[in-house]
């Protein structure tokens, strides 16, 4: 089966997920190509330039595919012009809500109208979050297939053993409004530990810091299913996160993590301090997180579902 994956980049977020899926599918005999498109490296021009240049590249290409799979809404503008028997669009969050968090309500309203149309271009829609699945169904009446994004646990064998830094609290993610990094910074003076911010590190370096930390904090205002939570689970690092988006699909409060309201620095600081001081609770949560990810989110568990998804797609 010949598949084209389309994403603005393949180094993180949904694009990183696309690269990981491609790698695993290739290992099982699929012919998967990643489409690389130049774009203007300016914040508000990245997605529009990607959509324009990518669409031109697709129109000029004579190559055909069994499946064209777009990752996130801007990639669908490119997918539309790819010569393929079937098309798929995957999202890791409600795109118009993400735009509203970063820009304005007016911009989001315009995007929302376009979004409802774009979703109709794909033969199949997928998401890794039941929360996102539910929102799109209620908002536009469209059906998404739910597919968890797996964690490639084999790659953690490259992460060396590190000394645990007691009291170290880590944030791993983009330095952007929706990630809530400013909320953690507001809480920082009340935290009885050292906060380390990893906003632009290579994956291995970020994982070394995560592995050495006592707590991972995910203070997001808006989220789908953060990959870093799964990574912390596997490394047995307890997680404190906001109860937004798909995060409660990973974390059961008090069992394999701690959930706090978004935009509440005081509650966030209190939760962090509790985990730092209660070693038994911290250990219990870390062990439960590890059990959850190993039982539910590895490629060994989920790859058969991905293979079946693509095979069934060509049967319809």
Give the predicted meaning of each segment:
Residues 56, 107-125:
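Membrane-proximal helix-turn-helix segments that form the acceptor-binding/catalytic region
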Residues 238-241:
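Short hydrophobic beta-strand element within catalytic cores of glycosyltransferases
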Residues 221:
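Aromatic "clamp/platform" in nucleotide-sugar-dependent glycosyltransferases that forms part
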Residues 253-254, 258-265, 274-279:
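Conserved acidic donor-binding segment of nucleotide-sugar-dependent glycosyltransferases
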Residues 67-69, 82-100, 126:
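Active-site proximal beta-strand in glycosyltransferases
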Residues 131, 150:
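Carbohydrate-associated surface elements
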Residues 267, 274, 281-296, 302-308:
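A short, well-ordered alpha-helix in the C-terminal region of glycosyltransferases
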Residues 162-179, 185-188:
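Conserved donor-binding/catalytic core segment of Leloir-type glycosyltransferases
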